[in-house]
């Protein structure tokens, strides 16, 4: 007989699961520089109201993956720059869809404490 604790998820340690887990989507606070806390969630949303920088997140753990849903405000034409940990295909950062209220999805995978591989799915409708 296993102890009760052996099969119980914990909230204060990193764990691996053999079945799907679901978390809430955490809203990021819009500002000149947006710094996600990757300990807070895997999936995020962000409505940008100006040209912004998505800074290197805090609390990176290799193996974490998720999405950041980025929405242009009602004005649009907003741009997004990226911190040095963000890595994209061919070394080129993607350009957001600039239409007012456009939605792009940034999919990411944390490789290490200083490297995040990401891909932008543009203009999702």
Where are these regions (language model features)?
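Fibrous stalk/shaft segments of extracellular and virion attachment machinery
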Residues: 1-26
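Acidic, glycine/polar-enriched metal-coordinating patches/loops
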Residues: 3-7, 46-125
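Flexible, charged surface loops at secondary-structure boundaries
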Residues: 10, 37-40, 59-62
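Sequence-level motif detector for i,i+2 pairs with an aromatic at +2
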Residues: 12, 39-43, 103
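The right-handed parallel beta-helix/beta-solenoid scaffold, focusing on the short coil/turn
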Residues: 13, 32, 42, 52, ...
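Transition segment at domain starts
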Residues: 23-42
